[in-house]
Amino acid sequence: MSHPTTFNSHLWQQHRLAQQPIEISILLTQMGFAAKVLAREISRAALMGNLGLMGETNATGDAQKKLDVFSNQIVIDAFSNIGLVAVIASEELDQVKLIECGQQAQYILCTDPLDGSSNTDTGSAVGTIFGIYRRQTSGYCSTEADVLQPGTELVTAGYVLYGTSTMLVYTTGGRVDGFTLDPSLGEFLLSHENIRCPETGKTYSANLSYYQEWHPHIQNFADYLSDRKSHTAHTLRYSGALVADVHRCLLEGGLYFYPPTADQPEGKLRLLYECAPLAFLVEQAGGKATSGLARIMDLEVTSIHQRSPLVIGSQVAVNLYQTFLEQGKAA
């Protein structure tokens, strides 16, 4: 019987065999540690009185849950005092948070610490999204300018899914690997090696409650997917947690889309710490991610809480979405 590969031993192998910088391995190890703490705290939140609202909103206007604030602090603590992270940009912070100054602090962490936090009160799936960049400026201390980088500059990205099991999925480019937490060992074990996103699929994820606010050509696309009398019919699977829905697309194919609306013409999801990290990961697995008009990875970032539409998943499904958009523009 072969021994399972732990996340830390996998990272060491990547450093030794694939010349992955040791700093990246250290940063990913810290994310793994934060994920273990979050998995524990999320699972017992109801017992510890950590459910419900804080009574405040975050930088992007979302109502903050107690677990949002708690999760944000866990991630910050995990990356503080290791000497590698210069600043952190988070959904839960109005501005970037300065962590370390000096020549060793060459990395930028962008994160949504608790994606889908509206699910916490019902015990449904939630997640953590992260993306890491290198500093671009040469000053002693980093600035917000170091954070405003396109997805093409990511050095590593991934997510953690807290559901029926806790799973960490990440990429440093070239491949995507997934690890499942064994609670009895307290270790993430390699469970999904070299994940490849299917070219197509029969499920889609979208918040259809906004259907009336979508442009007509996007409505036509949704109608096409849901036509039960046609061979084009897809099954709707929408959880309210971006990580959970993208994870399904990654493993089973299909697509997730969150288009612009009249009230939110720039989209709802945040480019820097939601769209770009997931786009990088899905592309490395053979999938595709677009705003509907442009590749997510190429979009210019002008503010830390900048929003973007997102269409992500299988190549065929995302291309079909874009076909409907082109037909709408040509009409």
UniProtKB/Swiss-Prot annotation:
One GO biological process term: fructose 1,6-bisphosphate metabolic process
Binding-site residues for Mg(2+) 2, renumbered to this chain: 112, 115, 274
Listed cofactors: Mg(2+)
EC annotation from Swiss-Prot or TrEMBL: 3.1.3.11
Pathway the protein acts in: Carbohydrate biosynthesis; Calvin cycle
Pfam families the UniProt entry points to: FBPase, FBPase_C
Any one GO CC term of the record: cytosol
Molecular function via GO: fructose 1,6-bisphosphate 1-phosphatase activity; magnesium ion binding
UniProt KW Hydrolase keyword: yes
Record's subcellular location: Cytoplasm
Keywords: Calvin cycle, Carbohydrate metabolism, Cytoplasm, Hydrolase, Magnesium, Metal-binding
Cofactor note: Binds 2 magnesium ions per subunit.
Keyword Magnesium included in the entry's annotation: yes
Binding residue positions for substrate: 115-118, 207, 238, 268
Coiled-coil annotated residue ranges, if any: none
Subunit comment: Homotetramer.
Protein name per its UniProtKB record: Fructose-1,6-bisphosphatase class 1 2
Source organism of this protein record: Acaryochloris marina (strain MBIC 11017)
Protein's gene: fbp2
